[in-house]
Amino acid sequence: MSLGRKQSIDNSAWLEAVATIENAVSREELDALTAATVADIKAHTEGKAAAYAWSAGKDSIVLGKLCEAAGVTDSMIGVCDLEYPAFAAWIEEHKPAGCEVINTHQNIDWLAKHPEMLFPADSAAAGRWFSIVQHRAQRIYFKTHKLDVIILGRRRADGNYVGRNSNIYTDGKGVTRFSPLAAWSHEHILAFIYYHKLPLPPIYGWKNGYLCGTHPWPARQWTGSIENG
């Protein structure tokens, strides 16, 4: 049985998929998809100023390896002052060589003024975190480095927007975002990590780690209540 939308998958199903990934995706299937994706990245970035967004999440870890194979070696990560200490330490140890850290500086004082952002109760509030940290940092990097395109690890299987009938689009602020993993399944991501023996940050070993994914600690979803969070 294949995994469905990320938000509707129980964390135990993720762990089962990780444990049995060889049965779901063969090395041959993965290698063919990898080669096609690297070719797609090359086709969209040749002769252009390009970089990739790295979040230390599982999708971006795969994205980074594919972009580097395609010759795109500049990258960035958006963080704030509310990251888990263990996650921040993992980023420093494992970030790509060409990765620039952009801190948007939301801190505990900011959180006190925006209590609705603590442990989001719905996807709309959770999406605001992505907007104010990752998307803002991407925009800053894009403009500062005068990029033509920034490459993201967004996938349709996560319910992410990747473009209308394509995997590339330009937003209202002039930032062109390209998502070469758009058609990759959850299983493809897990298989790439498994076959290439890639390390993952500690979040994935925590309770509901695959369900929540990487995030600043106040952005944690599915806590049930602020007290539980």
Language-model features: locations:
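Nucleotide-activated chemistry modules centered on ATP-dependent adenylation/adenylyltransferase
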Residues: 1-229
